[in-house]
Structures are given as structure tokens and as C-alpha cells.
């Protein structure tokens, strides 16, 4: 497994295993250290397995349903929904390739698969993580253009597909050096104790083998900048601009408000809260893992600290990062009314308050996540003397913003249902 995403691929095994129920024997003047096959007691391993199983199920079910809904419903073939579809696909790859192998890495010693699987799994893991992060940026850019610059031409479906191809191309290019350097290596001074009958086995590990340690540091720094720091900066800046723009227009809706004006103002508040949620989730999910990886490469930690970090803290950091792929379907999909209705329609779920299918079809066509007309305002609006429909805070200078707020409220994750 690529050591960028696993937890135990340290080059200093003597630091990790020191004091971890090891025995030393001398063979041909070589100090052999025996380590247990299972890294944890059954109770601790059970906690790891149940925790990873939970996010794995959420990731697989949630992202599969999102893919099914977008592909099945033609009225949802829009720019933002295609980005959400791409996000779901990349998150599915995270669930398939990252979660199980990382869990295995956290509970057993060594690499149980061959050399080819070492390179393939490491490459796919890195690509899926990078593609997921880059897609979050693409969604932020799409929303930013629509809200802050509503008069600029909207992205077309063709442009969205080109963007998606670029996303995967960049992800492959960034992670290729890691795949090239990944090799399965034998741990000459360690053997795994397989049973109580003193049966042992050679320890193999899948890790990056750089010619110089400085090259590894440089590559880790490049990954940190391109997969975390730069995307985080872009997401925070663009969502801050979106929030400021919505807050500015919401200020015009103060004082005496008609019910519809109050409703639009509340929608703006919900969107602003949603934007803060997106940025905070991204920061909190990935910051611990990147902090640990940078610490591992740039600091000299004591053997005891290294052991604690690799055996206990790294698994939690990976779990937290993978949680982002599990909650993405919720915050980007199921808080969207179209996705909820599509879910009900796809699986023929009848609820007491469900509207007739004809009404849903009409509403779904009107609620397309991103449209180019800018004239589809869902709420009742007032009319000016010239006959133009205007909502609170909407003027001839910005006739599309209320439409975009409606769409943002539908298309994006919201903390308020």
C-alpha cells in the first residue's frame, strides 16, 4: 500500500515495534525480531473493524445511490449533478480500495499481497483521493461563477465533461511518481509469529523506495500543497465570496418583510451555513492525516511517540479522512430535494406526504440544479410596475441571484432540511 495513505509503512520498524511483545534471537550474527501477526488485542481490533465497516457501508450505499439517481433521471443531467456524480465515483473508489486495505494495514503486520497489487492499489488509492478533492474544488468553482458572477456564461455539460477528464488526468499525473517508487521489500531483521506453535513467516512491506530521503520529503510536500493546501484555500476563498454576496443581498431584506421575502432571506442564511459546513468538514477530515504525514517526514520523533502514532493515531486519522467520502453523499446529495425525490422514485418509496408523480416530474424539471435561463424562481414574487418579477433584494442589476439562491438551496448540502 502506498505509504501516503497507510499507517504502518515506517522505514524504522525498530521504532514501531520496540516494546511490542517482541523477542530477539541471533542467527548468523543477525539480530532477528519476532513480532505478532495481529497488531492489537481482539477488543481493539474489533473497534477498528466496526468503525471502518460503518463508514465503508455508508460510503458504498450512499455513493451508489447517488450514481444511480443521476444516471437514471435525465432531468438531473446538469453540470453540477455531473460533478456530484464524479465525486460519488471517486468516493466509491476510496471506499473500495482505500478503506479495506487501510483497515488490513492497521490490524496485521506486513503486506499480504504481491508486488503488482502493491503498485496498483497504491496508484488507485492516491488517484481516487486526489480526484475526490479536485471534484470538490470544481463544485465550488461552479457555484462561485453562478452566484458571484451570474451574468457570465454558465458552464456547459461539454465543459463539465472536459473538466472531469482534466481532474482524473491531474490525479493520475500527481500519483504516478508514487506508483513508480512503490516496491514490495523484505524486512530482513523481522519475522512474523503466525501462531502459538512458533510458526513464523518473512515480513514483506509495500512502500515507496526513494533514492534519497530528501526526495520523499519534496514529494510529500508537493502532495500536501496540491491535494490539501491549494484545494482548501480555493474552497474557503470561493465559499467566503459566495457567503459575502448572499449576505449582502440578504441585508436588503431587513425591516418589514412579506412572508415570501422572509422565506428567501431564510434560504440565504441556510446556504451560508451550508458553505461553512462544507469548508469545516473538509478541513477537519483531512488536517489530522496531513499533519501526521508532514510530521513523519520533517521531524525526528522518539521511538515511543512513533509507535503510538503509527499504531493508534494514524488509524484514527485515516478513518476521519475517509469519513469525508462517506458523508459527501449526504451533504451533496440527500439534502438536495431532487435527490430525495429521485431516491423515492427510483425505489418506489411511498410516504404519507409524498406528492403525485406528475407533480414531482414537473417540479424536478423546474428545479434543475444549474440552469442558464436564470428566470426560474420557485417562490412567489412581487411585480414591479414594469411587469418584471422581482423578489426581495432582487433588482434589474442582478435579476438572476434569487434564482441562483433557490438553486443553491436545492443543489448543495444544507445543514437545515
Swiss-Prot record:
SMART domains: 7TM_GPCR_Srsx
Region annotated Disordered, chain positions: 382-401
GO MF annotation terms: neuropeptide receptor activity; opioid receptor binding
GO cellular component, one term: actin cytoskeleton
Assigned protein family: Belongs to the G-protein coupled receptor 1 family.
Residue stretches in coiled coil: none
Domain of life: Eukaryota
Localization terms from the record: Cell membrane
Name of the protein described by the UniProt record: Neuropeptide FF receptor 2
Cysteine pairs bridged by disulfides in the record: 118-206
Membrane topology designation: Multi-pass membrane protein
Gene name linked to the record: Npffr2
PANTHER family: NEUROPEPTIDE FF RECEPTOR 2, NEUROPEPTIDE RECEPTOR-RELATED G-PROTEIN COUPLED RECEPTOR
Alphabetical GO biological process terms: G protein-coupled receptor signaling pathway; regulation of MAPK cascade
Parts of the chain on the Extracellular side: 1-45, 104-119, 182-217, 296-310
Segments in the Cytoplasmic topological domain: 67-82, 141-160, 239-274, 332-417
InterPro entries: GPCR_Rhodpsn, GPCR_Rhodpsn_7TM, NPFF_rcpt, NPFF_rcpt_2
Amino acid at each position: 500500500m502506498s505509504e501516503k495513505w497507510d499507517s504502518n509503512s515506517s522505514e524504522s520498524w525498530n521504532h514501531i515495534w520496540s516494546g511490542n511483545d517482541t523477542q530477539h534471537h541471533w542467527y548468523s550474527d543477525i539480530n532477528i525480531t519476532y513480532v505478532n501477526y495481529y497488531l492489537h488485542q481482539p477488543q481493539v481490533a474489533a473497534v477498528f473493524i466496526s468503525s471502518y465497516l460503518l463508514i465503508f457501508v455508508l460510503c458504498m450505499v450512499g455513493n451508489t445511490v447517488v450514481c444511480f439517481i443521476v444516471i437514471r433521471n435525465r432531468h438531473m443531467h446538469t453540470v453540477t449533478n455531473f460533478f456530484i456524480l464524479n465525486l460519488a465515483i471517486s468516493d466509491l473508489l476510496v471506499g473500495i480500495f482505500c478503506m479495506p486495505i487501510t483497515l488490513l494495514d492497521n490490524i496485521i503486520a506486513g503486506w499480504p499481497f504481491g508486488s503488482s497489487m502493491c503498485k496498483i492499489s497504491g496508484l488507485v488509492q492516491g488517484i481516487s483521493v486526489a480526484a475526490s478533492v479536485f471534484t470538490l474544488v470544481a463544485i465550488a468553482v461552479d457555484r462561485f461563477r453562478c452566484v458571484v458572477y451570474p451574468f457570465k456564461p454558465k458552464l456547459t455539460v461539454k465543459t463539465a465533461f472536459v473538466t472531469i477528464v482534466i481532474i482524473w488526468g491531474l490525479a493520475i499525473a500527481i500519483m504516478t511518481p508514487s506508483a513508480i517508487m512503490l516496491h514490495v521489500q523484505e524486512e530482513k531483521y523481522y519475522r512474523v509469529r503466525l501462531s502459538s506453535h512458533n510458526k513464523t513467516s518473512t515480513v514483506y512491506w509495500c512502500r515507496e523506495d526513494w533514492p534519497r530521503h530528501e526526495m520523499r520529503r519534496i514529494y510529500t510536500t508537493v502532495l500536501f500543497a496540491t491535494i490539501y493546501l491549494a484545494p482548501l484555500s480555493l474552497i474557503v476563498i470561493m465559499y467566503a465570496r459566495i457567503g459575502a454576496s448572499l449576505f449582502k443581498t440578504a441585508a436588503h431584506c431587513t425591516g418589514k418583510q412579506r412572508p415570501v421575502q422572509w422565506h428567501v432571506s431564510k434560504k440565504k442564511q441556510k446556504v451560508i451555513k451550508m458553505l461553512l459546513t462544507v469548508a469545516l468538514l473538509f478541513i477537519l477530515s483531512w488536517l489530522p492525516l496531513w499533519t501526521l504525514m508532514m510530521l513523519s517526514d520533517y521531524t525526528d520523533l522518539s521511538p515511543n511517540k512513533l509507535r503510538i502514532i503509527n499504531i493508534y493515531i494514524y488509524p484514527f486519522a485515516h478513518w476521519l479522512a475517509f469519513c469525508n467520502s462517506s458523508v459527501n453523499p449526504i451533504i451533496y446529495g440527500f439534502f438536495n430535494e431532487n435527490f430525495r425525490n429521485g431516491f423515492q422514485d427510483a425505489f418506489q418509496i411511498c410516504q404519507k406526504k409524498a406528492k403525485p408523480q406528475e407533480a414531482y416530474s414537473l417540479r424536478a424539471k423546474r428545479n434543475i440544479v444549474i440552469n442558464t435561463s436564470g428566470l426560474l424562481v420557485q417562490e412567489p414574487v412581487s411585480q414591479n410596475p414594469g411587469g418584471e418579477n422581482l423578489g426581495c433584494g432582487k433588482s434589474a442589476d442582478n435579476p438572476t441571484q434569487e434564482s441562483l439562491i433557490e438553486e443553491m438551496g436545492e443543489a448543495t448540502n444544507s445543514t437545515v432540511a
